[in-house]
């Protein structure tokens, strides 16, 4: 099979992926690489939203999961990477509602059943987008087992869990405070609320004492407490004013009452340690129905909450008549105006505050007192904590266990109901007296109700409820399946730190409760992919990258259109276009999936934030080209020739052969350790350095010398080493760069006496310590140092690459004689003269261990001195420019960090060059 002259990722990626999937290579057991008796290895894909498209975070984590999957599959494990998607209740419902809006259709007019039919229709048409994109990245999931959280089997598991928890007394319905999105009109989880600092106001309002304590003569303001608030509209629901019990200013007033402005109510002055005496006036309004902290204070002081908002964010009929029906922000404006009119608004100050907004609607989220379904968490949390404390579940890096523990030690009951139509409908029914009957289906509920007429609860379950069951529901639970026995606990969960509580902890608790097993043995927490400057990637910032654009490339106009369409604030389009044109004047070139995967792996350290630099993609695309060209060289020199495959033929391994074979063993050891430690960056670095720095840059050059030696045995051994080391290196790199390694392996494998249909079914390389030859490794280290020294001498003497000159060398004669062919070829020498001592001359001398080296050339000392002096002056001028720039605080403070760092690197480079120039001048006697 002849290789193309250049590496074309697009040509090979689709061809190989369709073959891998079509042949069933991604499946565990006999259909894959390992039998049922092999050790089980399983990874659960965190199910992306069915509405979603592949973003950089997905692509990053999927690369790591696929690398682990391919690695363990090649190691002979019975390997399953379980894929699937999440129904994403809120996100999906919004997408379909927006489509209906474009047709001027309201879902409420359509009705629940018809709307759900539309959602399912959309899911079938568009729901597989992210799965197709994962395939482009090379994900070797078992797609035959792909699951969806609303599938029949998974839905049955959800119902079973709800019913069991309810009957165990762990699920209840109650009125509590929740995050409420008034646009969606549903409760939302903390993860669906994004808080950001915004400019606002702090209003200081006078709450008059109920009984005049100091008089109100001559039209003066009544006496009272001045309360500071950022939300005057909620004062209509105030039930108390709180002060700190140790605040001397107000201690004598505790137990008294104030009149609630604009309302005909009296509320108490209470003492609570929660109050910060330094904030505002030290007096805080307490609105238990519309603030989470106030709710807790209200519970402590037995205050009855008074909700004053409707579900769509308007003032309800429990407030004074003049505010009823007003939108909450219109009510705020009217309340402030009325307070001012009644001389009760003391002052208004600008104030920065954290404003919580729904991540889907951008609407300000309201704490709202509503009836919801809850899971009692304390007992479940205890078992979850024990699992980590005992080591049954291990976090990597270890510090994330602390975050997990903090969440579970301070856990609250879990609100699991959502006021949506799309999702798992809560399996609870009500009779006319509002009695609740929880059952697996309507028929069972009617039996429990004695045949009475029942109506099912309208709410659906929080998406995280079904996601919490993912590790065991996808394996067939509640049925007792072979997959459940084989693959649970799964091996590792690869996920982000932002969902340690929302997903990771809940999976641990649910799996322990229902299966008696932990869901996974290890949790590898990845960092967050950010842009090159360290900023979070977001549509509004205009710095989002599409992984497929990095694979296929994208023209500048198309990139601008993609970045500026669908903005929440269209006014940002101009600045985003400007930034994009500056960053990508030629658009984004095609790097291919392998280069992108290798980039992600190289970035996968144990840090919290990961800066994505596209220059790395370019570097790893160059790596792929280098590997491709190395394979072409090996094929051209080995195909149709004797590569030592017959055992009886004589072989004669040189130090260079033994060195590269030994270095391969060291690389295999290091890569295996890196996978064990989840240090994908170390695995990538080791593979890169071995292939590029040692095999390509050094061994191929040594091999050229050996192939030109005229010695048939040396040539045969060299070809054998070339082919076998390359074939092994391809297997070593395959989990990270699967496409190019498969394409090359098909051609290289026969030269190394390897047979098989695919590289992904081959055994993963394992180090053989007996192949380490310390003597050869030491000799080649010395040879490389001598070659580099000769190259440095050539540079110092300003010799052109085409100019070949003799070398005078002093040292061990046998060693120099052995090194001679390599030195002549790689250092471009015409001859090597081994001397007892070097002659006195102005030419520079290199000392390498016990060896002394000098190039035998005549030097025009005056001309060389003049050249070096001019170069020294130039470098000093450049150094001064760089020093001036770095001393300028405007430059250092305002220029991008990357630019400042580049300037520092330039200065360091000039400093090094200056030292070398001075050293050369000194050798010339200057």
Swiss-Prot record:
UniProt short sequence motif 'HIGH' region, positions renumbered to this chain: 48-58
Compartments (UniProt record): Cytoplasm
Protein name: Valine--tRNA ligase
Keyword tags: Aminoacyl-tRNA synthetase, ATP-binding, Coiled coil, Cytoplasm, Ligase, Nucleotide-binding, Protein biosynthesis
GO annotation, biological process: valyl-tRNA aminoacylation
Organism of provenance: Nitrosospira multiformis (strain ATCC 25196 / NCIMB 11849 / C 71)
Keyword Ribosomal protein: no
Binding of ATP, residues: 539
Catalytic activity line of the entry: tRNA(Val) + L-valine + ATP = L-valyl-tRNA(Val) + AMP + diphosphate
